Structure formats: C-alpha cells, structure tokens
Amino acid sequence: MSGDEMIFDPTMSKKKKKKKKPFMLDEEGDAQTEETQPSETKEVEPEPTEEKDVDADEEDSRKKDASDDLDDLNFFNQKKKKKKTKKIFDIDEAEEAIKDVKIESDAQEPAEPEDDLDIMLGNKKKKKKNVKFPEEDEILEKDEALEDEDSKKDDGISFSSQTAWAGSERDYTYEELLNRVFNIMREKNPDMVAGEKRKFVMKPPQVVRVGTKKTSFVNFTDICKLLHRQPKHLLAFLLAELGTSGSIDGNNQLVIKGRFQQKQIENVLRRYIKEYVTCHTCRSPDTILQKDTRLYFLQCETCHSRCSVASIKTGFQAVTGKRAQLRAKAN
C-alpha cells in the first residue's frame, strides 16, 4: 500500500450504522425497500406511534400466514372432529313421564280383570286331574268276566288232574304235556309252589393239625353219612382235588399229607356236592349215586331224573426213572 492511503484524515466523518427496517407497504401498495428509501447520513429518530403500528401489522400478517398453512394441512387430512354435545338427563322430566304412563295404563284396564287373569293362567298351568281308583267290587267283576271269556275259549289246556284228551281220540299237544309235567311237580313238591327253596345244610369240616406235615379231617365219616355217599368215593375226590395222598385211621379220621386249612377243604366239599349230590334238574339233595358199566349215574328221588356224572380223575403224576417211563409207554 502507498503512504498516501495510510494517512489518517481527521476531517472524515464516521459512518453510522443503518438500522434494519422491516418490510413495509406504502399506501399505494408498492413495496418499499432500503434501496427506494433515501439514504440519510444523519440519524433520524422515528416516532413511537409508527413503530407500534408496524409491529401490529407484522403480527396480523404472521397469524394469517399460520392460518393459511393450517388450512392447507387440513385439506389433506380429514375434517376436524366435531365434539358431541352431552345431553343432560333430567330426573324430574323422567318421573313425570313415568307418572303419565301409569295413568294411561290404569285408564286402559278393563272393568273385570280377574276373569282375564283366570283365562291366561288356565292356558299356561294345567290343573291336575283327580285320579279315581276303581273299587274292589269293580275289579272283581272284571276278573270274573275275563274268566268267563277264557272258559268259553276251547284251547284244550287244563290245569286239573284229568287229561284233556281222555274222552277223545285226538293226539295230545306239546303244551298239554308240558302243563301236565308242571302239575305233577307241583303236587309232589309243595315247597316249590310256595316259592320256598330247600337249603342244603351241612356241618363244617373239623380240621386239626397233626405234627408239622399232616392234617386230620376229624368228622369225615359224619359228612359222608349226611351226603349219603360212600367214604371211598368222597376220599378219592378229596385226594384228587388237593393233589395229595391220605388214608383213614382207626378213629375213622382222614389223615392227609400236607398243611391244609378249613377253608380249602370247604371249597372242595362244595364242588363235590354241586357235581355228585344235588340234582342237576331240580337242585334237590335227595339223590342216589349208582354205578353202571364203569359210569356213575345220579338219580333224583323227587323229579325222577337220571343223568350221568363225570368220573373222578386223579391229578398229574410225574413218572421218574427210566424203567417207569418204559413201562408207561408199553402200557
């Protein structure tokens, strides 16, 4: 830089900073900027009223711009939801309306409400009918009439002792023979007609332990007499069912090898009575056991039925030794 330019000139006046004025409009509507305004070197003090008017105009313009922006946004969005006005419920008005309704209903009621109520209730609830039971005389009369009708019908079936085909040459039917059989059974067994069945009563077996490995059946002979069976037959059945061996001693007591309780011997005796004592037809204990050509037959003394009975089979016996096996095969 040259020396002339660097010299300080005291006569030069200092430049004053210009105040920034806001955007203003003229009366004609033309925008007035800083360039249009005359540049003044001197400070001009604006009046306070003019500044206030300018500030108010600025605020109004800002509010308008904000409202325009909000309108644009609302155009894209849905319309603003209107708040629903809440209706206030008035208790006094409701009570008056209820009173009016009651007065109208009372005025509409008929003069005779009881008859209508009876009609309505009669449809819904059915009255119970009084059931009258017939008297004994009427029942007896009906029974007699039915008996007369049955007697008129000639079925050829009679429950008397005389046979229906006695005075005629016709053949008897199956039903007539069946009725005759039942009549004979009723005559010979009056207990069965009354509905009472004879119970077979037997003494319980008396079992005593003999030593450590034997059992004694004390009243064995007494039970054989009650059952009307031979001791040999009952002994063979007991030994076969228990799977052991035994014999009768001098006191007529059965001595069995092994330990047995009273319940076990009772179960064996029940099976023997069911198979070899009671009749398979009428369940009567009055029977006789007969042997005919290696078969046993059970004959009943009440119904005179006769049926075969299974023979007593011993249990499985293991054969030991080679010679015993050869003998068993040879036999």
From Swiss-Prot:
Modified residues (N6-acetyllysine): K263, K291
Keywords: Acetylation, Cytoplasm, Initiation factor, Isopeptide bond, Metal-binding, Phosphoprotein, Protein biosynthesis, Ubl conjugation, Zinc, Zinc-finger
Organism annotation: Mus musculus (Mouse)
Family: Belongs to the eIF-2-beta/eIF-5 family.
Placement of covalent cross-link Glycyl lysine isopeptide (Lys-Gly) (interchain with G-Cter in SUMO2): K102
GO molecular function: translation initiation factor activity; zinc ion binding
Name the record gives this protein: Eukaryotic translation initiation factor 2 subunit 2
A Gene Ontology cellular-component term: eukaryotic translation initiation factor 2 complex
InterPro entries: IF2/IF5 (IPR045196), Transl_init_fac_IF2/IF5_dom (IPR002735), Transl_init_fac_IF2/IF5_N (IPR016189), Transl_init_fac_IF2/IF5_Zn-bd (IPR016190)
Subcellular location: Cytoplasm, Cytosol
Role summary: Component of the eIF2 complex that functions in the early steps of protein synthesis by forming a ternary complex with GTP and initiator tRNA. This complex binds to a 40S ribosomal subunit, followed by mRNA binding to form the 43S pre-initiation complex (43S PIC). Junction of the 60S ribosomal subunit to form the 80S initiation complex is preceded by hydrolysis of the GTP bound to eIF2 and release of an eIF2-GDP binary complex. In order for eIF2 to recycle and catalyze another round of initiation, the GDP bound to eIF2 must exchange with GTP by way of a reaction catalyzed by eIF2B.
